[in-house]
């Protein structure tokens, strides 16, 4: 830490007792390093006092800081007391006040008069609109903006006055209050101040430093470098060049220090990386180049805080790791769960009868849970998925989740106050669970926020709706972060850019060195236009760019090995453009820069099929399978041997998933089950016209029974596409019944023999004495004019029911998935031939497709060959399945 070492040696040369000094720093991060340096120098006296410049300004102002939720509530109370138009409620107020408050703080910090800026904004809008007739409608956008600044000229002065009455102050007001006291403070204080490593000052901070310098009660140590200090074009030196012109720096007091470190030899590598997270994958390769494997002089600087989790994933081999940066609260799972809880409450206000499953499931997954709660949640999800419940009734939710420790959070709250109490209690319970440190901090932040909101609401008598509370919490989540602090003296440092101030590292690795990240560019949320900010000396994005330029150059000026990574892919707000700071050092510096292009290391997805060897265990299972072979097993094998292996041999099943729209499979089941109910009543009868006409009238009743069989809720079919699917299913059933009715009207004799006829133990010989046994169900068996019809219902269209089999293709004929319908019908034909009760009847097999139900049954036809030839091909297929030398190989579909 070269710069800090230099300061300490300078101070020790002046006074061996450092307790005489107050050391003022931009942030608290360097304090621990200063203490280490003092220890290394065997300093045994009292330590100096350490302050950030904000703390010193606060001390001088002597006002109580107020920010965040307490400030928002107090400010709204003032705003509503003024009866301004429009009379925004608290939720509307929260949409504009946080941004305005930042602007107001900027005005108070940088301008001579906040009233002048506010009046200027109002006058500016009036001038823009003087020649336009805005009419009487207050909703015209420009008129609303004009009214806004008119209101702010009333509201903000009153807010300042009310805050001052309580000795409360925003950060801008603290600066304004300190400004009036600085001269007296500098004159009367007996203390000595040392300002270290500053770059940009607010006017009040500058006045404080210069006043103390004038009274010889301060000294300043700057960390400048000739590379950007002497070159007027370099924005990094903008503020430091201005400081050097202060009259306080003269022959008796030199401007300290301007080094020449940037131009010293150093290795700089620029990495063009394809992908944001891919940058983190490069880190292990960079670490290999670092000789000191303790990484004690290495910093990884994340310009995008969202890369922290991915960075930690690749650093598992680093023994000592120190994180010093803020991680946004909004990126943590508990934060997402809290946001979802408030969204759920808002939905419950709209829908008083049921819960949408997608509103509930993520909450249950993301909230920390006990072992008991986890079991309750798993059972709940299993039952909801099994029954395909999209909208869960309140009664059912309580029935299935009644034992959940936080069930109250999922129910409609009686009031926001009661709900806040429940949230506070829940946070307390969660902290007793086994959760990691980050989640513990996450929960603690929210517990504190809920307490603040509850305590602050009481004196203001503000009526808070759940929607308003949601906005308040979301504002809090988006503005807060968890600050990580570890052991900074050991190991690898992971930091944000601001945390690097005053610190120097031999090896520096910066990620996301993209335009828009470094510098941030024109991305400020502000109501004050650029030209007005410039006119009143408020900081614009140009000043912010200069500040970030200084941080960048200062960090790398003392480094020996610099690695700059940027994401070259354009996605969302990222343009894929490298930071102009990289371009500057490429074009303007004397350093040789090595450029590397890192493509995404992931290989393209290969289409290599899965292959399962038929081991002895698999063969044993196949032997067991031979006792229960169904036609659907063989069609499954034709479609994909791996699916057959998993579902029919290993007996695995797909996980139940909730269908918001009825799937093709369940649409088929709905029609199938309905027809089963219709014809079950007619089984054993020779049908009459009246039978079928009565059945047509009762279709709705049969469909409802089918819905129960599917374990679906009736509400599932009440709207949207599912309502249409049900209507189509009804039409299909009607078409089937009408087709049968038409047959009878034409004088045909139709008898329903059986429905869902189960068969098993129908032996089918293989080679030698080997055999398999067929089992399964036939959807419908009827007799039409004495001919036995074997009917299989299909949702799909009919395909390839004409068999052309001969000696040349007999073995391979049914090894084609396009012929699976004919294969199934041939097996049914064989089975029925071997059922004694059907001996002597002519047999016809066919498919009745729901896709064209009016057509009726389409029969299997043999252009070449016969059923015996067909069964030879079936035998060949079964032998292939059983053959130990033929592996199960995945069929990869190409579309």
Q: Which sequence ranges carry the predicted segments?
A:
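Structured, non-catalytic alpha/beta "coupling" segments that mediate domain-domain communication
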Residues: 116-117, 217-221, 244, 636
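Anion-coordinating catalytic cores for phosphoryl-, nucleotidyl-, and glycosidic chemistry
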Residues: 1-52, 57, 61-64, 209-210, ...
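Basic/charged alpha-beta structural segments of nucleotide/phosphate-handling enzymes
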Residues: 28-188, 203, 378-385
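Low-complexity, compositionally biased segments
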Residues: 80, 91-142, 146-149, 228, ...
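Acidic-histidine catalytic/liganding microenvironments
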Residues: 97, 215, 835
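Coupling/hinge elements of helicase-like and P-loop NTPase modules
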Residues: 90-93, 235-266
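Conserved helicase NTPase motor core
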Residues: 128-239, 272-275, 506-507, 671, ...
């Amino acid at each position: 830490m070269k710069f800090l070492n230099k300061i300490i040696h300078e101070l020790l040369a002046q006074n061996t007792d450092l307790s005489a000094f107050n050391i003022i720093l931009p942030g608290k991060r360097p304090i621990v390093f200063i203490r280490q340096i003092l220890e290394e120098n065997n300093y045994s006296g009292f330590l100096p006092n350490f302050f950030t410049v904000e703390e010193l300004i606060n001390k001088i102002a002597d006002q109580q800081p107020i920010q965040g939720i307490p400030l928002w509530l107090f400010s709204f109370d003032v705003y509503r007391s003024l009866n301004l138009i429009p009379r925004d409620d608290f939720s509307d107020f929260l949409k504009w006040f946080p941004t305005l408050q930042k602007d107001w703080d900027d005005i108070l910090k940088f301008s001579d008069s906040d009233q002048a800026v506010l009046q200027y904004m109002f006058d500016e809008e009036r001038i823009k609109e003087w020649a336009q007739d805005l009419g009487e409608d207050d909703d015209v956008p420009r008129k609303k903006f004009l009214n806004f600044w008119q209101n702010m000229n009333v509201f903000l002065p009153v807010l300042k006055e009310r805050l001052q009455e309580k000795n409360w102050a925003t950060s801008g007001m603290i600066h304004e209050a300190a400004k009036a006291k600085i001269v007296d403070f500098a004159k009367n204080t007996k203390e000595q101040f040392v300002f270290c490593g500053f770059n940009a000052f607010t006017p009040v901070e500058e006045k404080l430093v210069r006043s103390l310098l004038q009274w010889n009660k301060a000294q300043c140590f700057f960390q400048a470098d000739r590379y950007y200090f002497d070159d007027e074009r370099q924005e990094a030196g903008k503020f430091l060049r201005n400081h050097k012109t202060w009259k306080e720096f003269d022959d008796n007091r030199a401007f300290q220090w301007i080094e020449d470190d940037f131009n010293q030899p150093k290795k700089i590598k620029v990495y063009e990386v394809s992908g944001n997270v891919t940058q983190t994958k490069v880190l292990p390769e960079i670490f290999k180049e670092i000789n000191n494997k303790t990484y004690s002089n290495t910093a990884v600087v994340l310009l995008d805080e969202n890369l922290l989790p991915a960075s930690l994933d690749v650093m598992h081999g680093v023994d000592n790791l120190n994180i010093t940066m803020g991680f946004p609260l909004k990126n943590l799972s508990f934060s997402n769960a809290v946001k979802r809880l408030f969204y759920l409450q808002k939905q419950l206000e709209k829908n008083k009868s049921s819960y949408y499953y997608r509103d509930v499931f993520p909450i249950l997954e993301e909230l920390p849970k006990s072992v008991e709660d986890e079991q309750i949640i798993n059972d709940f999800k299993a039952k909801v998925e099994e029954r395909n419940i999209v909208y869960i009734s309140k009664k059912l939710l309580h029935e299935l989740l009644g034992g959940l420790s936080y069930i109250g959070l999922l129910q409609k709250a009686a009031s926001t106050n009661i709900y806040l109490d429940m949230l506070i209690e829940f946070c307390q319970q969660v902290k007793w669970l086994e959760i990691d440190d980050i989640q513990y901090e996450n929960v603690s932040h929210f517990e504190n926020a809920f307490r603040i909101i509850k305590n602050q609401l009481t004196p203001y008598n503000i009526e808070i709706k759940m929607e308003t509370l949601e906005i308040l919490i979301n504002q809090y989540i988006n503005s807060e972060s968890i600050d990580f602090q570890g052991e900074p003296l050991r190991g690898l440092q992971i930091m944000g850019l601001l945390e690097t101030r005053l610190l120097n590292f031999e090896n520096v690795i910066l990620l996301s060195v993209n335009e828009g990240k470094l510098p941030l560019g024109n991305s400020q949320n502000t109501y004050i236009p650029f030209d007005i900010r410039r006119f009143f000396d408020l900081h614009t994005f140009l000043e912010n760019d200069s500040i970030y330029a200084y941080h960048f150059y200062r960090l790398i000026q003392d480094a020996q090995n610099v690695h700059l990574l940027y994401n070259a892919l354009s996605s969302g707000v990222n343009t894929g453009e490298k930071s102009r700071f990289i371009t500057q050092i490429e074009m303007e510096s004397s350093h040789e820069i090595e450029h590397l292009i890192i493509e995404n290391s992931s290989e393209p997805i290969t289409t290599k099929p899965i292959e399962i060897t038929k081991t002895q265990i698999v063969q044993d299972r196949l032997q067991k399978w031979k006792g229960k072979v169904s036609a659907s097993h063989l069609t499954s094998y034709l479609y994909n041997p791996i699916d057959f292996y998993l579902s029919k041999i290993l007996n695995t099943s797909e996980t139940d998933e909730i269908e918001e729209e009825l799937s093709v499979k369940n649409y088929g089941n709905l029609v199938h089950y309905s027809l089963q109910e219709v014809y079950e009543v007619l089984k054993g009868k020779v049908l009459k016209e009246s039978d079928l006409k009565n059945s047509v009238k009762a279709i709705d009743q049969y469909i409802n029974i089918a819905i129960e069989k599917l374990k679906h809720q009736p509400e599932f079919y009440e709207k949207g596409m599912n309502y249409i699917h049900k209507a189509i299913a009804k039409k299909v059933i009607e078409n089937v019944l009408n087709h049968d009715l038409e047959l009878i009207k034409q004088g045909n004799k139709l008898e329903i023999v059986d429905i869902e006829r189960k068969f098993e133990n129908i032996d089918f010989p293989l080679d030698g004495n080997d055999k398999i046994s067929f089992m399964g169900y036939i959807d419908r068996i009827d007799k039409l004019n004495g001919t036995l019809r074997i009917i299989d219902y299909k949702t799909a269209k009919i395909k390839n029911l004409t068999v052309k089999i001969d000696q040349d293709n007999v073995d391979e004929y049914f090894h084609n998935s396009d012929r699976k319908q004919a294969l199934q019908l041939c097996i049914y034909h064989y089975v029925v031939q071997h059922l004694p009760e059907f001996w002597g009847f002519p047999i016809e097999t066919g498919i009745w497709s729901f896709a064209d139900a009016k057509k009726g049954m389409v029969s299997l036809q043999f252009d070449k060959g016969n059923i015996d030839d067909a069964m030879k091909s079936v035998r060949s297929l079964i032998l292939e399945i059983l053959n130990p030398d033929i592996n199960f190989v995945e069929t990869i579909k190409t579309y």
